[in-house]
Amino acid sequence: MGLENPFKYGGVVRGPYFADRRSEIKELKREMANLNQVFLVSPRRFGKTCLLLRLIGGLKHEAMACAYIDLNAFPDIKSFAGALTALTAEALETNKDKLLKMFAGFQKLRPKLSVDPDGNISAGLELAVEEKDALSALLEGMRHAEQLATKKKKKLVVIIDEFSDLEKYNGQTIEKAIRSEIQKQTHIGYIFSGSEQSVMLAMIRDPKRAFYKLGRIMELGPIEQGAYSKFVLSWLKKGGYIVNDDDLRRIFEIGNDVPYNIQRLCNVMWDNAMETKTIKPALIEKLPVIIAQQDSPHYEMLWRSASQPQKILLIALSQDQTVKPFSKDFQLKHGIGPSSSIKASLDSLVKKGVLFKTLQGGYHFADGFMPYWIDYIGKTIR
């Protein structure tokens, strides 16, 4: 039986299948060693969650306690408060009897614990209060985490993923309350990460918002190509594949150095070259079209939801992905405008998740294979 396809995508990538992020992990470790606050901003498909889970392993190896919370999983403040309190407590205390005693002492929370046949504890908390008191329970949980970390003489790192979802709760009231509590803490570092870049930036760059200048902003960019190339080549060599270095660089060009794109291109390449084990330039050029065909139903749905001006703009951007959409040259070349109309289309497409706006103000396709669909597959339905 041959080696399984090592290029994983679409989920959490762990162990030997995780591509290099050494510099980013080193930087985040340094920040957390100093118990700072970091806002990690990243477009989707850049491997943010995989990076954070890899980071947790490294921090635990250095005797730091870690709690990871994905806000996508919690629809309201009550569930968020319960998760934060339970996960931070479990990170610092593993003795189930002590946890039970600890949870029994909360004013706003009541314990809900289950133990499997092997004696492993699974701790969760339910709120015993009305919705209007949920914020008080969250703050109680944050205070408890600080007190327990102090008692244990341990550094605690709290990672809140998809942090932009905080806005779905009760607006800026919770932001102010969380900031106030964080500023009192001395044993906890925080990483607030999010893929909704426009929402994240509004939260942390607006002087009127509570998180303004609470911590540094770190943008997660592409993986350094040299290290990533070695990762890809090592797996291809293990699988007995033959590829030219220049041809491999073309994969990074097509994928725009986006980790998800590279992983998927290599995944399709591995499968399509399995019989010959020889990767030729013609195959590499076909890869994005193969992927665009695979995802055509998804692109068709997005296309049908776009207005005519938005479709025209998307066609133009698919042809000129590095230009500025407000430039006169771009507008004249593609016969679009005025700038106010372009701005309205861009804002709508960003909101739909078709495009994303970079920290530098540029606009890119959220899905790097959609331009190939527009240019090749989508011609029949324009």
Regions found by a protein language model. Name each.
Residues 229, 233-297:
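Amphipathic alpha-helical "lid/sensor" segments that cap RecA-like P-loop NTPase cores
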Residues 50, 189-190, 194-236:
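Alpha-helical sensor/transducer elements of the RecA-like P-loop NTPase core
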Residues 32-33, 256, 270, 315-322:
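Short, locally clustered residues in the helix-turn-helix/winged-helix DNA-binding domain
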Residues 36-37, 41-46, 50-157, 188, ...:
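P-loop NTPase nucleotide-binding core
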